[in-house]
Amino acid sequence: MASSASKTNIGVFTNPQHDLWISEASPSLESVQKGEELKEGEVTVAVRSTGICGSDVHFWKHGCIGPMIVECDHVLGHESAGEVIAVHPSVKSIKVGDRVAIEPQVICNACEPCLTGRYNGCERVDFLSTPPVPGLLRRYVNHPAVWCHKIGNMSYENGAMLEPLSVALAGLQRAGVRLGDPVLICGAGPIGLITMLCAKAAGACPLVITDIDEGRLKFAKEICPEVVTHKVERLSAEESAKKIVESFGGIEPAVALECTGVESSIAAAIWAVKFGGKVFVIGVGKNEIQIPFMRASVREVDLQFQYRYCNTWPRAIRLVENGLVDLTRLVTHRFPLEDALKAFETASDPKTGAIKVQIQSLE
């Protein structure tokens, strides 16, 4: 099906030399207008809002995350929402004009993780923005309709925030946070802050959030007055844990949701949780770290990890639509697509105080 697109498709690229630039991107305007490249089951989305993730900055600045390496010109971005402007005739569930959030992964539907409902472990997944799969920081993208979730009248800004919300939801679900659980959140970056809001919505109490940045802790208190903030000091993991427990009023947390991936933070969380407690690592860290093994052993601490998310988007949409999780204040900076380079400079500079930077192409 053809579309009425009128602007050249542009995208935000990086490369192994750590350059960052805006250039024409695929699919071309002519292709979008004629619907030539739409495959069976696909729709064309005019991307309206895309959040900059820490991984986007990392791919730009460092060229890799673990084994995922930028080896050629590469389009960034995977936190997006937009408007459907064309649909393949085979698509019946979505129509032109629908507002959608894009789940940025395409799975094989044939491997063991896919067939058992844990498709985030798909052995042949194409995860958008993870090299070599191009990302969503483009004006137009073609994407399978099944991974385009209708958001109704939700703002595109909130629609783009559903991706990091899905990360937090996956963590809370697997960590098993229960009503009344004392919960520690390590890290007050975007994922930590959203995890905090989700833990509050799940009935966790008391809540303590840690960070090295007083500005981010202040922001956490503003959006969640119930939370107790704890500034991380240069102490041993054991001493840090004692200070954290003091912030809980002497209660040892049942669950620590670790959102930094930093070795010292993970170690402090292991020292802090109660006997039989759980440390659930949402953050991404180094290939190898040291942990206080015997502390975890003699206290029967469960240590779990997370890789992306699965089956979270419908739940995330319901949470936002019904006001249980308010993401609006997390977007602190907005830039038009044409000023994407300024957006990345803002997102990568701690001095700006940015929480979530979004690149928008609103028409």
From Swiss-Prot:
Binding positions (Zn(2+) 1): 53, 78-79, 163
Cited Gene3D superfamilies: Medium-chain alcohol dehydrogenases, catalytic domain, NAD(P)-binding Rossmann-like Domain
Cofactor binding remark: Binds 2 Zn(2+) ions per subunit.
Thermal response of activity: Optimum temperature is 45-55 degrees Celsius.
GO biological process, one term: L-arabinose catabolic process to xylulose 5-phosphate
Pfam families in UniProt: ADH_N, ADH_zinc_N
Record key words, sorted: Arabinose catabolism, Carbohydrate metabolism, Metal-binding, NAD, Nucleotide-binding, Oxidoreductase, Zinc
Positions of NAD(+) binding: 190-191, 211, 216, 282, 306-308
SUPFAM superfamilies reported in the protein's UniProt record: GroES-like, NAD(P)-binding Rossmann-fold domains
Family: Belongs to the zinc-containing alcohol dehydrogenase family.
Assembly with partners or alone: Homotetramer.
Full protein name: L-arabinitol 4-dehydrogenase
Organism: Neurospora crassa (strain ATCC 24698 / 74-OR23-1A / CBS 708.71 / DSM 1257 / FGSC 987)
